[in-house]
């Protein structure tokens, strides 16, 4: 399966847990591309069979996600009905489920079907989650 992992961390760059998530998916025989939300425009997203969105909360208390995520998903026309997964990196003790809900809300706004959501604890956990995609 051809999978896009959209990385929307708090700061620019690809964090280790996203690389581990992609590594787990590749171990299951999938073709995986990591798209950085800070540098990509989202136009390539319709070409993938499955889209995994990984984000981090930008605030410690509020569950707010990076604004760039909505822009990237909005630019990728043709996402209606696309199977997808939502992941959020656990960054604090509170409101992490609200941040995950906000990621899923942004995805569903574009018509994507979110069939899996999870909170990532660390890179090893992310790799284990990646091995469950398509299984």
Question: Would you name each region that the model predicts?
Answer:
Residues 1-4:
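Extreme N-terminal starter segment of soluble prokaryotic enzymes
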Residues 6, 13-135:
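FMN-binding flavodoxin-like domain, especially the glycine-rich phosphate-binding loop
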């Amino acid at each position: 399966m051809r999978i896009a992992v959209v990385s929307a961390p708090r700061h620019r760059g690809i964090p280790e847990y996203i690389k581990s998530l992609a590594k787990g998916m590749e171990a299951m025989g999938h073709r995986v591309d990591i798209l950085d939300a800070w540098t990509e425009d989202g136009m390539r997203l319709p070409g993938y069979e499955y889209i995994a969105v990984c984000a981090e909360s930008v605030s410690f208390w509020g569950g707010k996600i990076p604004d760039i995520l909505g822009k990237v998903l909005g630019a990728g026309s043709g996402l209606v009905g696309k199977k997808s997964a939502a992941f959020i990196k656990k960054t604090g003790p509170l409101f992490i489920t609200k941040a995950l809900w906000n990621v899923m809300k942004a995805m569903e706004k574009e018509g994507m079907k979110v069939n899996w959501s999870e909170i990532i604890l660390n890179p090893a956990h992310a790799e284990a989650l990646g091995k469950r995609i398509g299984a």
